[in-house]
């Protein structure tokens, strides 16, 4: 009992009976949303400026509510307006009406070209819409009335003065009913939607009767009704107008007629007219009842006399554009899985392996009876001899590319094949072109996109592969051309011919990987040629090399020995300078090989025995620097260039170094691996400066690590005394260790830091195993680069400001996407889609310029006006015509519609209105066809429902088209005593 009497043990259950039903909960939730959005109470905003509904910023926010298990979406639409402090301080007063009622009478934004349908029908700047969920609809009349009652209660409880609409029936009908409440006033928003139009409502007089009967004004003398009328005419048939785009001759291209194909030039333009319709709106913005006649017998509404004309164009949906299709088709190759061998059959490389091996063996040339010096070969035979290997196993008819097209492409890619002098043909000239264009902004675009310079071999190859894919056999044609390209690369490597269209020097890491690989191959060729030429022309050749030459001469006749001297030097270097390169030698060259190795060993032993060898490998004296120990001048040595690297090699090297870990042993090994170039430079320095010390090397190699101080000697003279920096004095310093290990060996006798033979074979193997899909991914940045340059070129010819802005956005977007090694396919598709959109915009500009005959305009002022008009048509949803039907653009448009009206057959007229429309047209004397749409806005202010009620705005909007008829009304009434 004591526990039961304890007040803390008592539990009270509180039941809220105020929201007992689902309907009341729904109303409560709507009120909560309105309160959360701060739509409670009065609002005071300045009247909207003219055209603000179109140029202003519209925003919306939404929330979801439930009515039992039925989901509704509440969305608040409003025009963003800046209110001044003066307007915020103003008191609205008791007699003020809600802002939405004031908007009903505002004429500044009638017929906005782009707006929510409720904005166009009622002229509102702010409203809330309650609509059913995604696939639901409120169809029954009882549910519609229930929702409307909920809206009315929520507005009354919250004091919200923003109009609230409910969407009913199927969503495609866009049927809304709603209400707006203010202090003592209310506006009901109603709507009628019909498919068949009664004849009496097809003209102004019939609509005035509806409006007046709906208002039910008790006054005997009705105030005048203000009227705004707009007729819209649609021009769809453009066949009689010139379409400037000339499509390519596809039959000629497919048939292999090279004359119809210009390599390096991308196609551009739309294959169909990108402008599908032109809409002319003739507007009478401010008319008064009684000053105009428009009934079923006669009409004063002549479009030529309309004070306002405006035009909009309807764009074709996804017009077929050649540049976009070109790039898209190339991008689709990324998804192919086949290899080149699967597409073309077994490669001829394996079956001709022995032949290729014989060519690659440099020493075998010594035993040939009549060797031909390489530098005397004609480059003209490159393409033909390389392709013979493939064509032995594949007939000409089976090749995806015919001979004419293939020859044209290869001559375009390798212009030096036309030269009879193969040693110094045109690679140097192509390099000059590259350097001369380096200042251009468009030229430097490749560094942003990681593609290749626009006049490089890689860039040209991308365009040719893209063209072959589009016009000549698709993926098989691409595989065929790539196979020929790889053969050409191997031929050039084996015969010491530089690759044209590539800049000198190390691979440019700002370019795509394929371009870097080709540059690497060219680097190998340059090193190989420079080494061979240097050995051939150097009279002070080392004893080991001289003995090799002598041995080789003994094996041949005197005449043959002279011819093969250059060959021997090249061959000796190809196998003796690298410990990792071995070549199979014939039996008659084993003696030569042993002799060469023995000579090399003797040279090394002599170096060890002689502690003070003669200086070797000097480049030039280094200013006034002297050796610290001997006082001799310090000479800069001839050093080996560091090994060029590509992106994949750098990544591979980074992975290897990272796997060494963070231990002391790993760090030491990592430092040893990275100091190969340092050790080579130290050996070259020791050979050029006998008797030098580490301090001498640091003074030349890293001056910041040698610190000099000004001190006084015993005699009081100022002298400079130097020492190594602190980091050079660290125990077990890698520099000290490398210096102690280094031997005085000049660069020409050192082991090569960069084995050009090995690296070239790596590149050639890398090229040979590329599938068409891999090749496409490598070259897609180049194709996008070319497409952007084409867009810039075409836009400059048309001068489209919006086009320039769009191109800059594409470049910015592309540079972010293509910087990654493996870009996402979806992002690449977005870039290609943006390119197609800009191409379509430029094609639309050309179409409009052709239709308005701007090129044939003789007056400069009139021409400028038309160009400005066309530019506005591309950027703005609707453009007013200066001078209406009497202006330059208006006259041209009038002629278009007159021609259209003359070609229309009577059966195309609307059956139910043909007689009245024809009669009224003949009466008014207009030569325009019947309008495709008629819009009317009727406004007035009357007391309602009693004569002594407050004068409130009334509005009705009507739109009549061939498909349907819609009436929307906003009728206000005084609720103070009713």
From Swiss-Prot:
> Does the entry feature the keyword Cytoplasm, yes or no?
yes
Asked if the keyword Cytoplasm belongs to this entry, the reply reads yes
Q: What is one Pfam family matched by this protein?
A: Rab3-GAP_cat_C
| Polar residues: compositionally biased ranges | 540-554
Q: Where is the composition biased (Basic and acidic residues)?
A: 586-619, 909-922
Known PANTHER family for this protein?
RAB3 GTPASE-ACTIVATING PROTEIN CATALYTIC SUBUNIT (PTHR21422:SF9)
* Name by which UniProt lists this protein: Rab3 GTPase-activating protein catalytic subunit
Q: Which organism is it from?
A: Xenopus laevis (African clawed frog)
